[in-house]
Amino acid sequence: ISGRPLDEANPVLDSELILPHARARVAALQRPLSPSGFSFAFRRHRDKSWTLPLFIKSKMLTPLAAGLISFLIDGARTMLVAGTRSAGKTSLLGAMLVEIARNNRIITSEDTLELPVAQLRALGYDILSMKTRSVITGTESEIAADQAIRTALRLGDSALIVGEIRSTEALALWEAMRVGALAKVVAGTIHGDSPYSVFDRVVNDLKVPKTSFKATDIILIANTITSPSGMERMRRLTQVSEVRKFWTDDPLLEKGFADLLTYNAKNDTLDATDVLVEGESEIIKAIGSRVREWSGNWDAIWGNIELRAKIKQAIVDAADKTKDPDFMEAGFVVKANDEFHKLSSLVAEEVGYTDPKRVYSEWESWLKAEIKSKVREA
């Protein structure tokens, strides 16, 4: 099914299993690597795409974090989702895909197909999935990851999503970021439990030049939090940091990383830092500088981030109030995002700027109408 060999000459297989109502990542071993014979590991994916409201509900992230992520995606930033194994990196990346406006083309590059491409395509997304050669079990007939990324650059103005950055594709990806070849959001996952560990892996292991690494704008860290008993593990977004551009050798020593959100273990919350609240984020101000009403106006930028956070929380509240979790699924979240963007444009045309209170009031009226419609259908 995978098109990749599994025999004594190739005793390792890394692939995906796609059934009508289930998806899973499969790792298989056989002799001689596994002397006792075949061994399999299955990692089942959620049938539907994760969304930011679903992560708010599960407490993986806060409404403010969701609003900030939404803002950064619309701002076409370069973003890495990092973390340890099974921390929810790919799930979070899939939820971020839902935040990309449907009028943008998306290109994904993966060696094992894990992102919810089919589900998003069914929702009307223009999305192209490229399957690349696995660094572990790939065959010569498959395309190398770096070649796939260079091909993506020739396909026009698109958002580029890389399932996992771990090999030769890193050089091609950061080269493209650095020269500005990608005008839309660029995102991917990578192993690392802190911004500096991501820097260390990218520069020292993957051999990306330090100057090229500066093309990274935002690093999100996902980790598993263990209960005092050690019996319960919870996924949490524990850190959101920006990569600043004015350092030369070591971003840790030269204050090249600035935290925007940090995890408070005592309260199990993701708290905003002074850098974010007081408008000292260079990346966010750079986004604002390209929007007339936001340029030099931190209050307007912050108001838009809070507006997005309020909308994400309202979706969760609607699901709780109606006892209908479908409100948090991708189908409805995409509709809610479309309505937010439409109302933002209409309000800006009418009053001259994107008034957060006015946008939310009209969006809330739309949400109430959607709830009534769903109740009648039920």
Predicted regions and their residues:
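P-loop NTP-binding catalytic core
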Residues: 1-75
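Glycine-rich, charged/polar anion/phosphate-binding loops
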Residues: 11-15, 24-29, 147, 205, ...
